[in-house]
């Protein structure tokens, strides 16, 4: 059963890791996309760091509750900034998907990382 907790952390983290890496290799496109929603360019680097560092910490189960809360807030924020054109079916799906992912992070925030984690080993 404990391995399912690890898999859950990996599954929730994967999309953020991939997106963070994609932003590095497509930095100019990332800036253009963010600016098209009036998000300032200076937020690109912190976004990339957040999308790579926090998921890695979640996967190993270190500072899980803090990472999960930060990622839940980040995920809800991105839903509200980038996915509110509900006339576009894909945007509606992305909005709802972000809310579902944030829900998973909130469950991690409440329950912690479980037995197979650095948090457990250090406690």
Question: Where in this protein do the model-derived segments appear?
Answer:
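Extended, low-polarity transmembrane helix blocks
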Residues: 1-25, 32, 41-49, 53, ...
């Amino acid at each position: 059963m404990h391995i399912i907790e690890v898999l859950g952390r990996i599954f929730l983290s994967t999309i953020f890791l991939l997106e963070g890496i994609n932003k590095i290799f497509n930095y100019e496109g990332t800036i253009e996309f963010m600016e098209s929603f009036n998000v300032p360019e200076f937020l690109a680097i912190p976004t990339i760091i957040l999308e790579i560092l926090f998921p890695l910490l979640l996967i190993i189960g270190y500072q899980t509750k803090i990472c999960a809360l930060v990622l839940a807030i980040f995920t809800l924020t991105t839903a509200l900034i980038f996915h509110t054109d509900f006339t576009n079916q894909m945007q509606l799906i992305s909005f709802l998907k972000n809310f579902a992912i944030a829900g998973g992070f909130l469950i991690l925030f409440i329950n912690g990382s479980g037995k197979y984690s650095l948090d457990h080993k250090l406690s």
